[in-house]
Curated annotation (Swiss-Prot):
This is Large ribosomal subunit protein bL9. The keyword rRNA-binding applies. One of its GO terms (cellular component) is ribonucleoprotein complex. Pfam families: Ribosomal_L9_C (PF03948), Ribosomal_L9_N (PF01281). GO terms for biological process: translation. Keywords: Ribonucleoprotein, Ribosomal protein, RNA-binding, rRNA-binding. It comes from Prochlorococcus marinus (strain MIT 9215).
Length: 151
């Protein structure tokens, strides 16, 4: 069996791993593809230290993002209820529905902080009343907000 070469990836490669990972590959793959195209570099003590420092910085940045999400979750629970005004027909049914975009606008208006509508899950809302929407603020942090739909 052929000897394998250990390399540090400089960019993410679907079949191998993500940037900064240490991988073992066939010598020909390393020599003919990864090294010439700058997708990996040989492992040296200096490279290992560099990868370690980069991972520490990424961990600090990820912790900061999580803390910001937790703070925003607290702010949302402090506000408590968001009101959305919609037009209503004679029988009390809304013209259209309340979408995650409507909820995002209401939250942005109240908190002055932009939120991606794709992270908001809203039940089917066709009537006036109170409803609960779920928001994914971070992979580990979710929030629930109360929505009051009025005419």
């Amino acid at each position: 069996m052929a000897k394998r070469v250990q390399l540090a990836l400089t960019e993410s490669i679907a079949s191998l791993g993500k940037e900064g990972d240490l991988v073992e590959v066939a010598p020909g793959y390393a020599r003919n593809f990864l090294l010439p195209y700058g997708k990996a570099m040989n492992v040296t003590p200096a490279v290992l230290k560099q990868i370690e420092r980069k991972k520490e910085k990424e961990k600090i940045a990820a912790d900061k993002l999580k803390q910001e999400a937790l703070d925003f979750q607290t702010a949302l629970s402090t506000i408590g209820r968001f009101t959305i005004k919609k037009q209503v027909g004679e029988d009390g049914v809304l013209f259209g529905t309340v979408t995650n975009g409507d909820v995002a606008e209401a939250i942005e208006e109240a908190t002055k902080k932009e939120i991606d509508r794709r992270n908001i899950t809203v039940p089917d809302i066709h009537n006036l009343g109170s409803f609960t929407a779920k928001i994914k603020l971070h992979p580990e942090v979710n929030a629930e907000v109360n929505i009051e739909v009025t005419s």
